[in-house]
Structures are given as C-alpha cells and as structure tokens.
Swiss-Prot record:
The lineage of its organism: Eukaryota, Fungi, Dikarya, Ascomycota, Pezizomycotina. GO terms for molecular function: beta-galactosidase activity; galactose binding. This is Beta-galactosidase A. The active site is at E200 (proton donor), E299 (nucleophile). It comes from the Eukaryota. It is found in: Secreted. It is an enzyme of class 3 (hydrolase). Disulfide bonds join C205-C206, C267-C316. Belongs to the glycosyl hydrolase 35 family. InterPro entries: Betagal_dom2, Betagal_dom2_sf, BetaGal_dom3, BetaGal_dom3_sf, BetaGal_jelly_roll_dom, Galactose-bd-like_sf, Gly_Hdrlase_35_cat, Glyco_hydro_35_CS. It comes from Penicillium sp. Monomer. Glycans are attached at N374, N456, N625, N707, N763, N780, N917. Cleaves beta-linked terminal galactosyl residues from gangliosides, glycoproteins, and glycosaminoglycans. Has high in vitro transglycosylation activity with p-nitrophenyl-beta-D-galactopyranoside, methyl-beta-D-galactopyranoside or lactose as a donor and galactose as an acceptor. Keywords: Carbohydrate metabolism, Disulfide bond, Glycoprotein, Glycosidase, Hydrolase, Polysaccharide degradation, Secreted, Signal.
Length: 1011
C-alpha cells in the first residue's frame, strides 16, 4: 500500500486512538479510526467489529498459541512448530521479542543469525499461520530482566514510565524492531496481522502514583507507528481491568484484550482445582470495558511455569491437562471469545542464561507441544478437537452470549449451561455445559432443553439420558449449518464437517459410555453404511429425523440423505486430521473460507502436517511413531494416487469412497556414545584462587556511587555487577588488602537470584560456600578465616552464580534493578575501605565477544572468558580427567570432549543429556552444559528439579562432530563428581520434516585481551 510522507505519519501517529467510526459490511459494524487520513494510513486488511476480527474482509476466529523464537534458536525447526500448530486447526501464533538479546550493548542493535526474525516470519507464511507481534519493550516472559537488557539497571528513571531517561533508552530498540516487524505485516505480504505495544501494563506499587500513564503508552505506540506499523494494536491487560481500552484517551489501543491464568501454578498438586477459580464474569466485564471490540484473551493459560526446586513440568502438564482444556477453554467460548491465544503452545528452552531466576533451563511449560517438540500429550489431541470445531463454525462468531443458568436448560442444578444464541446472520446456537462445581469428578445424567427452529425441545427425544463425566464440558449445537443441511441439534460434539462434490460429511464424537442424539431437519430416513447398527436408532419427530446412538470404540457411519455422519468415540477422534488442500502449489495457505472448504479429512496417527494435489497424485506429509493405518475421506475428484511423504502408496477404496492404506514403521537403530567412555580433557577454571593469579586486566570496582537509582550502596564502592557492564552468568570478585593480623571473620551478603550460590577463597584457602536454596535470592554469611600474617597481602575471591535478572512486572517496583554481586561485607579488624575490589563477568561485558551466540550465552568463568566452551578448544596441554572422577575438594573445573553422530535420516530423534544422582542427600554442585558452544543446561544438583536436558538437532550435529563441555563447580569439602551423565533418545519419529540445518557454531580462537 502507499504510505504517507514521514512527517504526516509522525503527526498522525501522535494522535490519541480513542475515537472510532463505523460502517456496515454484510450487516456487521466494522470499527475504524475516525480520522480519514489515519484510516488510509492504517490499512484495510485487518478490521474488526464487536464480534470478531476480519482478515481480508472475512470474519475469522483467531485461535492462537504462544511461541518464542528465541527459545528455539534453530531456524529450520520453526516450520515444525508452525505445522504442528496449524494441524490443531489454529490460524495464528503470538510471539515475544527479547530486547536483551538484540541490544546487549547500548546503542548497538543486532538481530542477525539465530536472532534474525525473518526465518520465523517466512516459516509462518509457509505454514499458513498469522502472527501477533509482541516486542515490548517490556515482555516479562520469564526471561532475564523481563526482556530488559542489564544495562537498564543504570538508567536514572523509573522503568516502564514516562521518565525521559527510560524512554530514551528504549528508542533504538523500539525503532529497529518495529521497522523489522513492519516489513512482515500483511500489508507487505507478510503474516503479521496484529501488534501489541508493551505488556501487561496493569498495576503499580511502591509509592509510584503515575499509573496508568496514557502518555507513556502513547509514546510506545507512536514509536511503532513511526516505524511503519499499520496493523491494529491489541493490548494484554494482566486481568480484566480495562486499562488502555478504546475510548480511554491517550495510549488507547485498537482492540482491548486481557490475560488469565485461572488455575494458577501449583504443579505440586496437579489434581487440585481450587474452588472458585473458573471465571464466570468475563463477558459482563467485556461489555462494560470494551463493547465495540471482539472479546480477546491475549494470554490464556496453556501451561505453567515451574521454579527452581519445583516438581518438574510433567506435573505442570498434568495440572493443565486435557480435562483442564475441556472445562476452561469451552468456558472461554461461553463468553464469545473471538481471539484466544494460549500461553504457551510450545515453550522451548532457556538456553544461554536467557531465563529469569524464577525458572530453570527448561521452559517446557507443560504445553501441548513439549520442549523436545513431541505431541504425545493428550492435551494436544484434545486441543485439536476444539481448534477444528472453531474453524468450521462461523456462526459461533455472531452468536450472542447469554447468562449462565442451572435451571433453564437442564433438569439438574448440578450442571450449568451458558447459551450463545443465534443471530439474524446465523441461526446457529451453542450451549456450553459444565458442572456447577467446575472441579466435580462426578458423572451426572441430564436432559437438555433448548430453543431451536422447531421450537423448544427436551433432549434426548428418543429416550435415555445424556451424561457429563467429571471434569468435562461440552458444546451442544442447534440449527448448525453443514453446507446447507440444518443439524437441528447434536448432543455429541462436532469435530469438523466438509462438503465433497455432491456429498457432505459431519464428524461427531462423544466420551466413553455416553448416549447421544442428533437431528437433521427435513430428513425422513437414515441407514448405517459402515459398522454395526447396534446401539443406533432413528425416528422422525416433527419435521426432523432424530438419530440416537451409543458411543463405541468402533466407528459407525450413518447416511442421512446426502449427509454422512461419522460417529466416533473421543479417543478415536484424536486420530483424525483436517489438512487444507491448496488449489495451487503445495503450501496450505492461511485459513479462510476457501482453504477451509478445500480441506480433506485424514485418519492417521501421530501427525498429519499438510496435503496437496499434484496432477493425479494426492500428497500427504505426515509423521509416524508406529505402523499406522491411513484413511482419506473426501479425496479430491482429480486424485487417483496417494503419495505419503514422497512415496506412492497402495490404496483401497471402499463403498463409501474412503481411501485406505498403511504406513509401516520400523524403529531405526540409534547409536549414541557412552559419555563416560569418551576421552575427556580438563582445566582448572578457577585460577583466580591461586596466589600467582594476576587480575590486573580486570575491571576495577572503584565507583564510589551506583547508577542504580533503586538501590543505594552499603559498600565503600559499588560491587553491583551491572554498574560495570556484567549482567549474565558467573560473576567473580577479588578483594585485595594488607593484613594486620586481627582479621578473624569475613561477613558478606551476596545476591544472585533464586537458587544461586557462592563460594569464597582467601588466597588459596577455601573459606566456604552458600549452596543455595530454591527460595533465597541472597545470603548473609560470616566465615571464619585462617590466621593471617600481619603486613602480608591477601586476596579474597568470591564467585557468584548469577541466575538472571528479576522481572519488572509491577510498575514502580524496579525489581529489574535488583543488583547482582556483593551487597555488603565486613572484615573484622579492618575498615571496609581497606579492601580494594576488582571484578569480572563475561569477557568484554556489554562488548561481548561471541556475537553469534549473543550477549547472554557465556558468563565469567575463566574457561568461558577464554572461549574454551566453543568447538576445538586448545586441550593439548590440559589434564586427561573426567567429570565422572571430578574434584576432590571445592573448586571449579572445566571439561571438554567430542563425539561423532550419524543418526538415521528421515527420522526426528529427540536427544537428551541426562544427569543422575545416586546419593540420598544430593551433593552441592553446579554444572553448566555446553553443546557446540551453546550453553544448553544449568544443572544444580542439590536444588533441581531438572535432570534431563533436551538439545535439538541444529545445535547438535546429527551427522558430524559435536563438542561437549561442562563446568563443574564443587561447593563441598570433599569436592564433586558426576554419578551419571548420559546421552539418550526417546522414540524416533518417521518424519516428513525437511532438512534441519545446523546453526553457526564458531570454533575456538584465541581471544585478544582474554584473562
């Protein structure tokens, strides 16, 4: 589209976004900005009314999942995630951008290599997935600093406010990232349809009285508009508070949205659903706060975070499981949600120190797609049922949500029904039923009374009862349109429907042991054309044919006129997929009326990625983890042959026109090295604890002040690491003094974030350690010193494990400025000023050396500063020793080895590095895992919980040499060693995924100035 001149753009962007005008499209009111020039500037591709968003003029339910590209730094794997999201029936992905990774050095923006967003955009477009861009500048996201680079600790102003110093600090990043996103907008042929400024701008504390500040939000929005952002702004209030909703003045967004995590994060008790946690007021609050925009849940719970010392993400997945999805997501549908984004759909990994101290390396999140990218959790399959239902139910978007009732629609107060009643545009109505006690595990029988075009009906009409099992919810439909055939009602849930040539197919499913009915208006008879007729009966009631059926594990197909109704149990429905078949080319395209209509129905196993027609050949791209029967329902009329993953497959066609075939799966032989048998070389990575060590090249901690406006000094000079440009990984401090012989004890308070630890030496004598806990982010300790000789020079060496910077979720808290380093200290018999300090972190600090792996990947250990964690380190003069032998005293040692892999091609083989502990009381030690130079694991043996570290192909070279390195930090008198350390695989998946390309893995080169 044609953009206006830059000065006009700037002028328009500075206007408040509160006012709106409307016009009519097919009977619906579409909201746009009041200023004609601004409307021209903004675009016509993405519009909205009170019911939904329109994309290219078509009403669209946006069903989305959260994916963070920076948590999967292998660009050729993006398509894998997008195709798995697409297969759910979803049409969108939301993504954050982590400022800390792109501007680690203030004023120097770098988004190249693994940080380049263009491959992410390209993969989304290839898969047919729209994007919501969420670049902050603040993102929270359980990343270090909430996405703020560490140097913001030195900004003299309150973060996330209109303080000039803070706003100026955001300018470079904000302009660059918005310009990048602008190029990928739908207006430029890209996938981005929405843009979120800021993140959860929802509350303040600690004496800050400037919230909410519309001028601050307006500044963030203007930056985006100035850089070319023209798609609508959407917000994500942390709760339904109405902040920055349209009409609120400066800083108002186009579409108001909010977040919700109703079941919380108590993964330790995955079967506990606390009373009162199911929201019931969202529709009411939406009508009060933003009635002119579609109801949007921009973050709704898709999993949970887990802290250090937690119970692990398997239990988070159990807490937020398939039952949670049925009850809570269908409850969201009862409010008429039109934009639903699940946080997370794929979590990924906090590699390279990018996480905050409240979490560990894994960011699996218990999400539908696991950290290792598998989709074996039942919640993925359950989500597929709902996603595909939404995709083929356009009437839902214009149905009117009503009030919940325990008496109007059922014959028992044990159940609650919320109606979404048909409108002038669509007669379809939807009735969301759940237990009144949403956590109930009881099975309740009921009858349903609902309004239909045939009058009020009490169902079942042919006898029997309906059943709602414990922790279940259903969406019953009435007057549901299937390509012109009116389904008067169905108590079984709709998975999908399609029209194929002159035939229509409707797929219904129910839970085990349930009884259901559906009725077809105008029909008079039915026949069972596949499967047993046992448990199926039909009768004409009024002007509709009613079919009653009992759920069975065996599929039945009932023919009613030109409609074939597939009757499935839920577990069987899990194996069905609905890939779009493009009319041109091989890419599925974005979801719209045309591409949805072109879809086929495929019964398969693990995953169906896509389908396309090439001449007479119907191609299906699919993944398999077992020998799998394949069925194709609705093969295109021109298709004669079935080609699966490039191989022509023998098929049979039954009397119902269903193609059947089989794909054989043979588990490949996967040969992995024994890590214990490898030749390991090692080097002391704490030479600082030797009397001969020279720290003259270190940074002098000589600031008699701090630039941290939120924390005052308690030491003669600042020992806050970020004051000197060190923000990530291990921090080392060396305090020099001349003894007077009176020194008996050393008191120190250190701060490194939750689960951190420290160790202290004086000269070469070990003084003690803080091994850390799962809840403490700082520690006060007094250590007894050996006898010191008067007049002799001594050095106190303090090593601190920086676990990341705190987030800044509440405005005014300034939590992100919580320092890392030494907060206070005292040496008995000496003034504090008698000690002169030096410090270091990663080599170069903000002028970080490894620009390929980014500003956070390496910390301040000697081996890291030298670059020994990279491939091909200079190990010729190192000791031959193994981490399985380890250290016999406190210290830190660095180990390196290499191994070759040549894994079977054509399989997606998840690999994990697993640590084991054979002692009942875990020893206190810490390990960093480096794979080809990338820090892909931070293991704290005495805190946990993570012991298994998945590393994706692309970081690991599946067909070549790999360099593996470990730092082993022993914090006990008897040292530490690894009891067990293995490389393992889980089930290989026969895959249609293309080649996975290894990321750039720069090898070791001697670093100028390294110390």
């Amino acid at each position: 589209m044609k953009l206006l001149s830059s000065w006009v753009v700037a002028a328009l962007a500075a206007q408040a976004a509160g006012a709106a005008i409307s016009h009519k499209l097919d009977g619906f009111t579409i909201r746009e900005h009041a200023d004609p020039a601004k409307r021209a500037l903004l675009q016509k591709y993405v519009t909205w009314d009170e019911h939904s968003i329109f994309v290219n003029g078509e009403r669209l339910m946006i069903f989305s999942g959260e994916v963070h590209p920076y948590r999967l730094p292998v660009a050729s794997l993006y398509i894998d995630i997008f195709e798995k999201v697409k297969a759910l029936g979803f049409n969108c992905v939301s993504f954050y951008v982590d400022w800390a990774l792109l501007e680690g050095n203030p004023g120097h923006y770098s988004a190249e290599g693994i940080f380049d967003l263009q491959p992410f955009f390209d993969a989304a477009k290839e898969a047919g997935i729209y994007l919501l861009a969420r670049p902050g500048p603040y993102i929270n996201a359980e990343v270090s600093g909430g996405g703020f680079p560490g140097w913001l600790q030195r900004v003299d102003g309150i973060l996330r406010t209109s303080d000039e110093a803070y706003l100026k600090a955001t300018d470079n990043y904000a302009s660059n990232i918005a310009a990048t996103i602008a190029k990928a907008q739908i207006t430029n042929g890209g996938p981005i349809i929405l843009y979120q400024p800021e993140n959860e701008y929802s509350g303040a504390c600690c004496g800050y009285n400037g919230f909410p500040d519309g001028s601050y939000m307006q500044y963030i929005e203007d930056h985006a508009r100035d850089a070319g952002i023209v798609v609508p702004f959407i917000s994500n209030d942390a709760w339904a508070a109405g902040h920055n909703a349209p009409g609120t003045g400066a800083g108002a967004v186009d579409i108001y949205g909010h977040d919700s995590y109703p079941l919380g994060f108590d993964c330790a008790n995955p079967s506990t659903w606390p009373s009162g946690n199911l929201p019931t007021y969202f529709h009411t609050s939406h009508e009060q706060q933003s009635p002119s925009t579609p109801y949007s849940l921009v973050e709704f719970q898709g999993g949970a975070f887990d802290p250090w010392g937690g119970v692990g993400f398997a239990k988070c997945a159990a807490l937020l499981n398939h039952e949670f999805e049925r009850v809570f997501y269908k409850n969201d549908f009862s409010f008429g949600v039109a934009f639903l984004n699940l946080y997370m759909i794929f979590g990924g990994t906090n590699w390279g120190n990018l996480g905050h101290p409240g979490g560990y390396t894994s960011y699996d999140y218990g999400s539908a797609i696991s950290e290792s990218r598998n989709i074996t959790r039942e919640k993925y399959s359950e989500l597929k049922l709902l996603g595909n239902f939404a995709k083929v139910s356009p009437g839902y978007l214009v149905a009117n949500p009503g009030d919940l009732s325990t008496s109007t629609y059922t014959n028992t107060a044990d159940l609650t029904v919320t109606p979404l009643l048909g409108s002038n545009s669509s007669a379809s109505s939807f009735f969301v039923i759940r237990h009144s006690d949403y956590s109930s595990q009881a099975s309740v029988e009921y009858k349903l009374t609902v309004p239909t075009s045939a009058g009020n009906l009490t169902i079942p009409q042919l006898g029997g009862s309906l059943t709602l099992s414990g922790r279940d919810s259903k969406i019953h439909v009435t007057d549901y349109d299937v390509a012109g055939t009116n389904i008067l009602y169905s108590t079984a849930e709709v998975f999908t429907w399609k029209k194929f040539n002159n035939e229509k197919v409707l797929v219904l499913y129910g839970g085990p042991g349930e009884h259901h009915e559906f009725a077809v208006s105008g029909a008079s008879s039915s026949s069972v054309v596949e499967g047993s007729s046992s448990g199926i009966s039909s009768k004409k009631v009024g002007k509709a044919l009613v079919v009653a059926w009992d759920v069975s594990t065996a599929r039945r197909i009932v023919q009613v006129g030109s409609l074939k109704v597939f009757l499935l149990d839920r577990n069987s429905a899990y194996n069905y997929w609905v890939p779009q078949v493009p009319t041109k080319g091989t890419a599925p395209g974005y979801s719209n009326q045309e591409t949805t209509a072109s879809s086929i129905i495929v019964k398969a196993g693990y995953l169906v990625r896509s389908a396309y027609l090439d001449g007479n050949d119907l191609h299906i791209q699919a993944d398999f983890n077992a020998t799998t029967p394949i069925e194709v329902v609705g093969a295109p009329s021109g298709a004669k042959n079935l080609v699966i993953n490039g191989k022509k497959t023998q098929t049979k066609v039954d009397k119902n026109g269903i193609w059947s075939a089989s794909v054989a799966y043979t588990a490949p032989k996967v040969q992995l090295p024994s890590l214990k048998s490898l030749k390991w070389k090692s080097v002391d990575t704490l030479p600082e604890a030797k009397n001969t060590y020279d720290d003259s090249a270190w940074t002098s901690a000589d600031h008699a002040y701090t630039n941290n406006s939120a924390h005052s000094l308690q030491t003669p000079t600042s020992l806050f690491a970020s004051d000197y440009g060190y923000h990530t990984g291990a921090l080392l401090f060396r305090g020099h003094f001349t003894a007077n012989g009176k020194e008996k004890t050393f008191f120190v308070q250190t701060k490194g974030g939750t689960a951190y630890g420290h160790s202290i030496w004086i000269n070469e004598t070990y003084v003690g350690s803080w091994a850390g806990t799962s809840i403490n982010d700082n520690n006060n300790a007094t250590y007894t010193l050996p006898t010191l000789q008067s007049g002799k020079n001594y050095v106190i060496t303090v090593v601190i494990d920086n676990m990341g910077l705190d987030e800044d979720w509440t405005i005014g808290s300034e939590d992100m400025k919580n320092p890392r380093g030494i907060i206070q200290y005292s040496l008995s018999g000496q003034e504090a000023s008698a000690i002169s300090w030096k410090l270091t972190g990663n080599l170069g600090g903000e002028n970080y050396r490894d620009t390929v792996r980014g500003p956070l990947n390496e910390g301040g250990l000697y081996a890291e500063r030298q670059g020994f964690h990279q491939p091909q380190p200079p190990t010729q003069k190192w000791d031959s020793s193994s981490p399985f032998t380890g250290l016999t005293k406190p210290g830190i040692r660095f180990y390196s080895t290499s191994f070759d892999l040549d894994l079977p091609s054509g399989y997606d083989i998840p690999l994990y590095f697993n640590f084991g502990n054979s002692t009942s009381t875990p020893a206190a030690y810490r390990v960093q895992l480096y794979v080809n130079g990338y820090q892909y694991g931070k293991y704290v043996n005495n805190i946990g919980p993570q012991t298994s570290f998945p590393v994706p192909e692309g970081i690991l070279n599946y067909h070549g040499t790999n360099w593996l390195a470990l730092s082993l930090w022993a914090q006990e008198d008897n040292g530490a060693k690894l009891d067990s350390f293995e490389l393992i695989n889980t089930t290989p998946v026969l895959t249609s995924l293309g080649e996975v390309k290894s990321v750039n893995q720069p090898k070791y080169q001697a670093r100028k100035g390294a110390y």
